[in-house]
Swiss-Prot record:
<comment type="similarity">
    <text>Belongs to the RimM family.</text>
</comment>
<dbReference type="InterPro" id="IPR056792">
    <property type="entry name" value="PRC_RimM"/>
</dbReference>
<keyword id="KW-0143">Chaperone</keyword>
<dbReference type="GO" id="GO:0006364">
    <property type="term" value="P:rRNA processing"/>
</dbReference>
<dbReference type="InterPro" id="IPR002676">
    <property type="entry name" value="RimM_N"/>
</dbReference>
<comment type="function">
    <text>An accessory protein needed during the final step in the assembly of 30S ribosomal subunit, possibly for assembly of the head region. Essential for efficient processing of 16S rRNA. May be needed both before and after RbfA during the maturation of 16S rRNA. It has affinity for free ribosomal 30S subunits but not for 70S ribosomes.</text>
</comment>
<dbReference type="GO" id="GO:0005737">
    <property type="term" value="C:cytoplasm"/>
</dbReference>
<protein>
    <recommendedName>
        <fullName>Ribosome maturation factor RimM</fullName>
    </recommendedName>
</protein>
<dbReference type="InterPro" id="IPR009000">
    <property type="entry name" value="Transl_B-barrel_sf"/>
</dbReference>
<dbReference type="GO" id="GO:0005840">
    <property type="term" value="C:ribosome"/>
</dbReference>
<dbReference type="Pfam" id="PF01782">
    <property type="entry name" value="RimM"/>
</dbReference>
<comment type="subunit">
    <text>Binds ribosomal protein uS19.</text>
</comment>
<keyword id="KW-0690">Ribosome biogenesis</keyword>
<dbReference type="GO" id="GO:0042274">
    <property type="term" value="P:ribosomal small subunit biogenesis"/>
</dbReference>
<dbReference type="InterPro" id="IPR011033">
    <property type="entry name" value="PRC_barrel-like_sf"/>
</dbReference>
<feature type="domain" description="PRC barrel">
    <location>
        <begin position="94"/>
        <end position="162"/>
    </location>
</feature>
<keyword id="KW-0698">rRNA processing</keyword>
Length: 163
């Protein structure tokens, strides 16, 4: 699978300040805190933030960044996405992929006929869902596990799920 190495991947969003010393609450989009810590430096709207400390919290994680030293600075980050370039993510085995790599791939039916482009991956609790936009800009969703066959440069969608 060919991935855009400079594409920014959001790993967490700052949800607010925690305390008065500049710590922030994070809503993580990864389950692995150790892997999150390993990135070390994140981009926040183009500004680098260096992770000093990370700990679990009932509402997600609490983080301290070297550049943020008081509550006002922490509050100013509310809603900010913490990103890393796609190339910073670890390589995966040949039969695995990151969902971000699926976005933008052309989607075809089993005969190879174009049906649209993948535009999003969602999870509403029952499994991962791929959203596809047709040429007429109408969108439909298919369950990834049952309906999508992933190839390096396109996705094959099972006929039963095509609208």
């Amino acid at each position: 699978m060919v991935a855009a190495p400079d594409r920014l991947i959001t790993l967490a969003v700052v949800t607010g300040a925690h305390g008065i010393t500049g710590e922030v609450r994070l809503k993580p989009f990864t389950e692995d805190a150790a892997q999150f810590k390993a990135y070390g430096i994140f981009s926040a709207n183009g500004t680098p933030l260096t992770l000093k400390k990370l700990r679990p919290d009932p509402k997600g994680w609490v983080a301290r960044f070297s550049e943020i030293t008081d509550r006002n600075q922490a509050e100013a980050l509310r809603g900010t996405a913490l990103t890393v370039p796609r190339k910073a993510l670890p390589d995966l085995p040949a039969d695995e992929y990151y969902y971000i790599d699926l976005i933008g791939l052309p989607c075809v039916d089993p005969s190879g006929q174009s049906i649209g482009v993948s535009v999003a991956v969602e999870n509403y609790g029952a499994g991962d869902i791929l959203e596809i936009e047709k040429a007429d800009e109408k969108r439909f969703m298919v369950p990834i596990a049952q309906a999508v066959d992933v190839h390096d440069d396109h996705l094959v969608i099972a006929a039963d799920f095509i609208e």
